[in-house]
Amino acid sequence: MGSFVLHGNIIDSESPERLRVAADSYLVCEEGRCTGVFSALPERFSGLPLTDFGDRLILPGMTDLHLHAPQFAFRGLGMDLELLDWLNAHTFPEEAKYADLSYAALAYGQFVDCLRRSATTRAVVFGTVHPAATTLLMELLEASGLVSYVGKVNMDRDCPEALREADAAASLAATEQWLASARFAHTKPILTPRFVPSCSDALMQGLGELAARRGLPVQSHLSENLGEIALVQSLCPQTDFYAEAYDRCGLLSQPCIMAHCVHCPPEEQDLLQARGVFIAHSPLSNSNLSSGIAPVSAYLARGLRVGLGSDLAAGETENLFRVMAEAIRVSKLRWRLADDSASPLTVAQAFYLATRGGGAFFGNVGCFEPGFAMDAVVLDDSTLLHPQELTPLERLERCIYLADERHIAAKYVAGTRLF
């Protein structure tokens, strides 16, 4: 963690509806945290090292609330299927390969290198059922300089034998084994029941007890696909809606991320709000697997906590600029074709989701207010040619639709420069 000053065109979110622009300004970091943004550098900071990024854009680092590291290897493939068929045809066969640590080292190394080059500074990641491979993934992420949560997946039913843990007791024992090795400074464990169809009642109950006993966060999937929801209703007839199956086991009582939430009825939304659950909106995967379009603007309007997920590999890219653009795009389709009661997402709202919205899962993360972690990406958009001068906000909007890792000139996580 360092202390320094950056100069450039600084943009962050004040709220979901309001962006802050400080053109030709100074961002001060002390001991890894933001001190403030200033139009002129105060004398008291004149002794700090200054990096002048000139006309470049300085943005908060982005948080990916939901992605599957073992699926990185087959991103862009198998998009002609819906969720349950896609899992059986592509996901489960690939994840079974991670029993082989040499394969895991190669594949996870490629994944981490790609994530490090992206605009993502923090991520919440699914591994596989394999404790050793999941610990290896955590080691690689720790060395990368990123901040993350990583989960060893739990599955003891309704999945291929190569991935199915023997029973709830065996799955919980493997999880305890993994937790004993998952001791890193910036890469923390998160309990990860894959979803209700692949976890027995006993396993779900045991994970809820483990979460409460150890104070561990939880991540899973919720109401992604209509076929999945129907399956959960058949498996859990005593529940009124999907999220209740998690809540009965205490899995919503700890800090929790539920990915997708495409088809949540009002009573399910009420429960998520009451428990403070984070929704990981994953528009790329919801489009690719024909799952639907989550009513994200309505979620924001009622005060639900929402961030963005790339959802590799059902989402084809880790590039959160592309995820922001897709979130805006599909919200327009939902508004036009399905529900005109909630307006489409704006650029300001999408940017908030990628930065401050998801960053809140990690605490004071995702903007440049005093006391927030100094996570930043510096964009050089000079190759995105335009015949006239654009404002910083216009440049940001273009970057949401056009930028990728080639436009990232520098990246900081908790006050440390990665490149």
List the model feature ranges, each with a label:
Residues N9, L27, G32, D55, ...:
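Divalent metal-coordination and catalytic microenvironments
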Residues S15, A373-F419:
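C-terminal cap of metal-dependent C-N hydrolases
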Residues A73-L106, K152-A168, N225-S253, F278, ...:
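Active-site gating loops and adjacent loop-to-helix segments of metal-dependent hydrolytic enzymes
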Residues R75-L146, S171-F184:
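Alpha-helical scaffold segments that flank or form the walls of functional sites
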Residues A132-C261:
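Metal-coordinating catalytic core of metallo-dependent amide/deamination hydrolases
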Residues R248-P255, S297-L385:
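His/Asp/Glu-enriched, well-ordered alpha-helical/loop segment
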